[in-house]
Amino acid sequence: MRRHWITRSLTTAAVLTFSFCLTTQFVPAQAVDESRLRHSGDGGKVPEPGGKDAGGPAPRLADGTPNLGRTEIGKGAWLPKLYTDYSSLLVDPPKSQGVPFQPWAKALQEYRHKATSESEDPASFCIPLAGSHPYTRGGVHPIEFIQLPEQKRILQLMEFPGHNWRDIFLDGRSHPSKQELEEYPTFMGHSIGHWEGATLVVDTVGFNEGTWIDKEGHPHTSQLHVIEKLARTSMNNLHIEATFEDPGAYTRPWTIAFDLAWGPDWAIKEYICQSNNRYQDYYVKTTKGATGTGNAGAEFGHGHPAKGTFLGEWGPNGGTQDRLMVLMDWDGKAITGTINPGPQAMPITKAELNPENWTLHLEGGASGAGAARVVLDGKFENLTWLARSLTGTYTQGNQRGTFKITRQY
């Protein structure tokens, strides 16, 4: 199967008004000052994960179930540790083999790692952290588990990025049908769990594609399936293993392992992510029609550069749909970049946006008669800052087909 991606960038400022929400003067949504450390309790004096300070045996509930949260008379919370790149936590395959990427997923992760900053991180838009990402974000925003035996479920509470939670159902239910998961994917997915001795096993599916697996930008598709194993090995330590299975992005499942420390004096405080998110103050606004050719093109207002990643599929009418990745760059003045439908990158030679009906026309390829070319004609949909996509038709030589790509925050 062929894989297609755009290796550099293209972007339109008018679309940015709704669909990119990016800024030049970026302040990370998770930024806090030292007073936040003091306010949260013990000022960061927390046992090192997996360290010698066990703090005693792991507590249990009245029915003997391992207690992942506070004791009845105590307080405290788990503190995420900063594990930037999950490849450093690999246990299967070995670290020497690396994460088993598919080519398009590796290209996207490398782009996010080398060419981007926090301005593309979904968490910078107050988007929830999915899978095991909340445990490895670092910082001073704790996590709590609220066990509700009478309801046969566990609530996982996360202070960052903005009072998120997820339900872990322990009542023996199955996941929703594949059709329902495809129709209503979510940021956190659908989680069911069970106990294997002292280990909580959590099975999660039904993710949308709007999150990163880790802070380094490991991508995933809606096929992502995560198995987490959580074991409180002592009062002060939580051991976590997470297995990621995603045949749309990786060639095989891969597993990481790490530990979190218990902060005995910590608790979740009010943290309103949106109040510290500056993106919406710096939307790029259109002052002229977005028409340009190569580097000479499209003059737009305010001159704010922006980046964005679109993922989706394209393929011939009635044929197999292949993965399409579009990495977009808007330098504040022009739509630039390349279109790469094969091994050779095609520079953008023409870009036209009609802001009245939100259509975008892109042409790429070498100049001259008979040169290989690709043409994309699309229309933007879902014009909100949380969900937006570009759907349309393409022409490549004698081949014609359709495509749909969605902005990945």
Each language-model region and where it sits:
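N-terminal secretory signal peptides that target proteins for export/translocation
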Residues: 1-8
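PEST-like low-complexity, intrinsically disordered acidic/proline/serine-rich tracts
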Residues: 26-325, 332-346, 355-359, 363-370, ...
